[in-house]
Regions:
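C-terminal catalytic lobe of FAD-dependent flavoproteins
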Residues: 135, 256-314
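A conserved short coil-to-beta-strand element within the FAD-binding core of flavoproteins
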Residues: 145-158
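Glycine-rich FAD pyrophosphate-binding loop
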Residues: 27-46
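N-terminal Rossmann-like FAD-binding beta1-loop-alpha1 element of flavoenzymes
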Residues: 8-33
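Short beta-strand to alpha-helix junction loop
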Residues: 59-69, 119-135, 233-238, 297-298
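Core beta-strand elements of the Rossmann-like FAD/NAD(P) dinucleotide-binding domain
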Residues: 5-7, 156-162
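Flavin-dependent oxidoreductases
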Residues: 20, 160-244, 249-257
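Flavin (FAD/FMN) cofactor-binding and adjacent substrate-gating region
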Residues: 72-144, 268-269
Length: 314
């Protein structure tokens, strides 16, 4: 017998946060539709690196819990990497120490000081985003949800008893919320010359950093974090700098064949907005946006909290 469906929800936004939220709702028995302006493969989520780690996201006391919930989910999904796009991979955060992290870090399995004493070593989920987004969509459809390409210009006109706003940077104009700002990230994808571990070295006082993530489709090199920059066009000089910084860590990267350039705009905000509000006609609006550079890192934790808010609104 088909599960009894409780009520209708439309999730606006089909990146990793929107799709994960929709999956949680659908598997809780909610009749859910995702409305997205662009297909998932053209969202910011699709161009992410994407390593599980709280990066450029606040508030830390809440982020830690959301991230750990997501970590547990990804560790289970990593048992089926070809299907889910998730693998657990070893790597090093250079220049980072345990005492600068929040209480959540004590619950990350295997997180330790690196052997050379110059950072933190860990086994962390590395997500192949195009594969993972396709898997989330398939899981949603299996649970009875639907995905539709729709352009939304007014959240109050979305025809559902509960509307969930997962529009990321789009919330700046749609809500409107001027606290949402773009942080431009540029990446270079190269043919992997044999790198099997990830690496990051991030200077939060600079708009450039150094990291590389081995993905099935190539080695992802980064990166940048340019506040209030809107351009989606790759900058050749920036790309050359990215390759040079990564090659200073692993010299074999210098001669690797370039496969692609990627640019994404992280939806930065002073704090994630995760709350329920009434619409003018009494229906409910649940906001779940502003995840900065850590949407995939907190996706499951935020999705479950958003689902609880939806349930409270029913």
């Amino acid at each position: 017998m088909e599960r009894e469906r409780s009520h209708d929800v439309i999730v606006v936004g089909g990146g990793v946060v929107g799709l994960t939220t929709a999956v949680v709702l659908a598997e809780n028995g909610v009749r859910v539709r995702v409305w997205n302006r662009d297909p998932a493969e053209r969202t910011t989520s699709a161009v992410a690196g994407a390593l599980w780690w709280p990066y450029r996201i606040e508030p830390e006391p809440l982020v830690g819990g959301w991230a750990l919930e997501s970590l547990a989910e990804y560790e289970e999904l990593a048992t089926r990497p070809e299907e889910t796009g998730i693998r657990v991979v070893e790597g090093v955060h250079r220049g980072m120490s345990l005492d600068e992290l929040g209480p959540w870090a004590a619950r990350v399995p295997g997180l330790r000081t690196a052997d050379d004493g110059e950072g933190l070593a860990a086994l962390l989920p590395l997500i192949d985003m195009p594969v993972h987004l396709a898997w989330l969509r398939a899981r949603l459809l299996k649970a009875g949800g639907t995905v539709e390409e729709r352009v939304v210009t007014d959240l109050a006109r979305v025809p559902a008893p509960v509307v969930v706003n997962c529009t990321g940077l789009g919330a700046r104009e749609l809500v409107p919320d001027p606290a949402v700002r773009p942080v431009r990230g540029q990446l270079v994808v190269v043919a992997n010359p044999g790198v099997t571990t990830w690496f990051t070295s991030v200077d939060h006082s600079s708009d450039t950093s150094t990291y590389f993530f081995p993905q099935p489709g190539g080695l992802i090199l980064g990166g940048t974090a340019e506040d209030d920059a809107w351009s989606l066009e790759p900058d050749p000089a920036v790309a050359a700098g990215i390759i040079a910084r990564c090659a200073a860590v692993r010299p074999e990267i210098a001669g690797a064949r370039v496969l692609a350039h990627r640019v994404g705009l992280r939806p930065a905000r002073g704090a994630v907005r995760l709350e329920r509000l009434p619409l003018p006609d009494g229906r409910a609006l649940v906001h779940n946006y502003g995840h900065g550079g850590a949407g995939v890192t907190v996706a499951w934790g935020c999705a479950r909290e958003a689902a609880a808010l939806v349930g409270a609104a029913a």
